Every structure is written in C-alpha cells, then in structure tokens.
Amino acid sequence: DYVIAFTVIGLAGFLRNKVSNPSAAAVTGTVGVCALRYICHVISGGTVWAGVSIPSTDGLLYSLSYNATYMIPETIINAAAVFWLFGCLNFRSEKISVAKKIEKNLAETVSASISILSLMVAVIVDAVAVFASLQNPDSGVLDFSLISNTNFTLVGIVSAIGIVLCVVFAIIAKVTSNSAKKVN
C-alpha cells in the first residue's frame, strides 16, 4: 500500500526533458504520479485490505471512494504548489536559482503567489469541512452516509471566496506583468 504508492512519486520528473516549460512539465508529472499513487492505493484497498479494515462487500467501490477523499485534494494542492515553486525557482541550471521573471517583476510574483495560495487554502478548508463530517464519531470509520452532516454553506462560501481571490490576484499578476513589459 505504501511502498509502491510512495515510490511512484520519484517518477514526477519524467517529463523534465520532454516539455520545454518547466512548470508545465512539473505539474503534469505531479498530477501523473498522484494518479498512479491513487491507483496503487485503490488496488491495495480493494484486494489486500478488503475484509480486514475495509468492508468486504463492495471493497473496490469503497476503496475508490475512500482513496479519492484524500487523493483529490492532495493532487490539487500538490499541483498548485509545484506550479508556484517552478514559477519562482529555476531548477534547470546546475544550481537552483530565483527565476528571472521574479527578479524583473516582484509585484507579479507576489500577486500570482497569493492567487495560488488562496486556491490551496480553499481546497484545504473545504476538504477538512467535508471529510470531518464523513467520519463516524462512534467508530472512527469513514461513512459516506454522513455526507448530509457537511456544512455545504460553509464549503460554498469558502470555495467562492477562494476562486474569487484566485481570479482577482491572477488578473492583478497579469496586469502588472503587462505593465512591466510596456515599461521595458
């Protein structure tokens, strides 16, 4: 369950020399290995753990659902973090250095960073709100029938705020980028 699933993370750089845009290569690699990791966890859950810690009836369906509850938010957060990191740092040279665009336009970088961070925070808060309500307080077992206990008003508000902030700061980053190009 863990050895193979976490070993595939080492494959994240498989597109490094095949895609010219470092951020695109890193994000695609990250999403790809998260998908592989999800598949490993599902196979393990549906075969090894069925009947032990997972109900044996519908073990595969339970494993698909259970593993999606943490792999989907984790994939979104990892992809956003990798996108931000590869936009800020240059990993293509012998020594890791600050990306040239940051040196040229700090306002764009800060705005883009806040944009990504607001989306990541919204995903984390939403995941905590949803998944906390899915855990049976008596047994501690994940119980999808408890989904009605989720405060979807909170989830909707947090999602909306996160998306609005993400878009607003992305626009600010684009505007500052365009104005910096006009100055140069």
Specify the residue positions occupied by each region the protein language model found.
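Loop-helix junctions at membrane interfaces
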Residues: 1-184
